[in-house]
Amino acid sequence: HSQGTFTSDYSKYLDSRRAQDFVQWLMST
């Protein structure tokens, strides 16, 4: 189960990174 928890947390981390990159992209245009 720890593997699933890690994957879940990691996907949340990737989502937050993607959101930040998206905001940066919006600001730069």
Swiss-Prot record:
Keywords: Hormone, Phosphoprotein, Secreted
Domain of life assignment: Eukaryota
Positions where Phosphoserine occurs in the chain: S2
GO term, biological process aspect, one: negative regulation of apoptotic process
Subcellular location: Secreted
GO molecular function, one term: glucagon receptor binding
Pfam family, one: Hormone_2
Transmembrane region(s): none
Family annotation (SMART domains): GLUCA
InterPro entries listed in its UniProt record: Glucagon, Glucagon_GIP_secretin_VIP
Any one cellular-component term (Gene Ontology): extracellular space
Induction text: Produced in the A cells of the islets of Langerhans in response to a drop in blood sugar concentration.
Family the entry assigns: Belongs to the glucagon family.
Biological function: Glucagon plays a key role in glucose metabolism and homeostasis. Regulates blood glucose by increasing gluconeogenesis and decreasing glycolysis.
Protein name according to UniProt: Glucagon
Gene it is expressed from: GCG
